[in-house]
Amino acid sequence: MSHTSSKKRIFSGIQPTGNIHLGNYLGAVRHWVDSQEQYENIFCVVNSHAITIRQDPQELQNKTYELAGILLACGIDTKKSHLFIQSQIDEHAALAWILDCNIPMGDMSRMTQFKDKSNKNPKNINVGLFNYPALMAADILLYQADFVPVGEDQKQHLELTRDVAMRFNRDYGECFNIPEPMIPQVGARVMGLDNPQSKMSKSAQGENHAIFLLDSPDVITRKCKKAVTDSQSNIVFDESRAGLYNLLCIYEIFTQKSRKSIEAEFEGKGYGHLKMALAEVIIESLRPIQQSYAKISQDKTYIQSVLTKSADSIRPIAKNTYENAKRLVGLV
């Protein structure tokens, strides 16, 4: 089932837990902003997913509005795109139940993220965490998305989404568009500064692990200085030297310079020089975002009104999809 817009539709979701960091920005948000002319974008703050792990209620509310404000500051333009909060639209949870009843236990049991997250939080293994992929599928399918930007860690969930959509269409009748993955090549995997073997994460514990979009210049400089490298001295793009490679890739993305010119720039120079140059580039690149957020965050009612208006404009699509699915399975 397709939609009537001439532009292809993209659904993107981001959780309001933790703080948004450089990996989120370079791997996802920056591409979202750049794609607004080419695609019809639906950006969703997926706060219902966040409560699969126990949250402080007030903190969750605050982080939800903070994330929305940061996305606006990064350049999400609600005249061109939709930006709303998942829990504003009841059809997400309602469709997830219908999908739950049409996903075999075996398929859900194979989801590696459930195993990873339950191992990290053994005292908080709940049904919501297990059913997380069904809600994610509902998020996507509600809006008849053509594409979903996904990292490597979410590809399995999108495959499940595609499988359940195709199975539903076959068993009940045409209802869902089958979404395709959109995997950005550049900046898709920004690694942790303190552990370049693992992806930069909002939930990592180390204070020097990630650079957050609202970090001050002093904090950014400190984190860059403490970034893990190696004992060699030449500065070249070499994937086997994970720490150095990560820093160079971040520098490459922000400066838009070629790898050859970057290697020439740092020829004969030490890691300290690279780290300071990287810190300066990050600080200057984040400055307009931080300045914009400082203005936006002063007016919470503005953020709320933007989110409400966007939710109201997108709700008919969700309602139409849900009502169709509901009718097809025989619910009244």
Curated annotation (Swiss-Prot):
Key word DNA damage present: no
Binding site for L-tryptophan: D139
Residues that coordinate or bind ATP: Q15, P16, T17, G23, N24, G151, E152, D153, V190, K199, M200, S201, K202, S203
Listed Pfam families: tRNA-synt_1b
Location in or out of the cell: Cytoplasm
Catalytic activity, reaction form: tRNA(Trp) + L-tryptophan + ATP = L-tryptophyl-tRNA(Trp) + AMP + diphosphate + H(+)
Annotated family: Belongs to the class-I aminoacyl-tRNA synthetase family.
PANTHER family, A to Z: TRYPTOPHAN--TRNA LIGASE, MITOCHONDRIAL
Protein name per Swiss-Prot or TrEMBL: Tryptophan--tRNA ligase
Gene source species: Helicobacter hepaticus (strain ATCC 51449 / 3B1)
